[in-house]
Amino acid sequence: MRSLRDSQRNITIEIEKISDHPFYTMSYYGDDCFEEYLLRGAHSLEDYCAFIDTALVRKPDHPICDNKFGCGAFVAQNADRDILFARNMDCECAIPMLLRRNDTFSYRFLSLVNMAFLDWDESTYDSLESDRKLTLATAYSPSDGINEYGFAVAILTDAAATYPQQNDKITLFDMTLPRLLLNKAKSVEEAIHYTEQYNYFYDVAPLHYMVADASGHSAVIEFVDGKMVVTRAENKYQVVTNFTLFDNPSKTGFGKDRYENILNALGKQEGIISEKEALELLKSNVIPGDEQWSAVYNLTKKTLSVTFLGDDENVHRFQL
């Protein structure tokens, strides 16, 4: 295990390498200035990085990896009526980090972060003290996660999205919205409320977001013609990939095949699926060559089961 400390911010980070894939876990303690970021916002990637540099890293020139990703996610139930939130992360490169936040600065949450977005490479762990890069900002950009109330969120690319730009709202980097929601939302309704309070900007490609809560409610939050729109589940299950769901009855777009495969599989089982079956369904609907991780969150029990690089023989399990 390696540790990183920032005495000025009273931050302690503990990182452990779990496998040579590589896969790491991180426990993050202390104030990472996220609330300050929400008050200030950022209008571009350069502006965002400047805030991180000033508030946390205090070093210039920390690029964020250009990394497009195409993913799939769904919400269903198991036979015990536990709510399952499942997602694939498919992208060109990934260094997955299991992140825990267990302090007074936010709701407790468990999430997966792609450290490649934060300029990590496979040598960063061994040179952590001398090469901080953007490690201190890890908790700003979870790709998916669950908090102590059983609320979950995941990001997915939606190339057609157009974000709102209203003069009376603060603008955020779209990759940081999941952190905001994990910090503050207990339910889908609260997530929708918090999301509509801000403008957003993107770097490589815009996003849409799947959200779900322990009561079984789910929705996909999207941005069409500069307005936030919400598509709620019509059944006890819901699916999303990489095209806009709103006002798209033919479900046309990138990821249509994966969307239909998952939807049909869930329909045949009336939305009832075990965690093992959910992982298998994810594995059979990846983008070949881009598969990075498949994760199933149990929103009732607040657990995570995750596999990496299509290796379904090694399931890593975590409890919030």
Predicted regions and their residues:
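N-terminal mature-domain region immediately after signal-peptide cleavage
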Residues: 1-184, 272-320
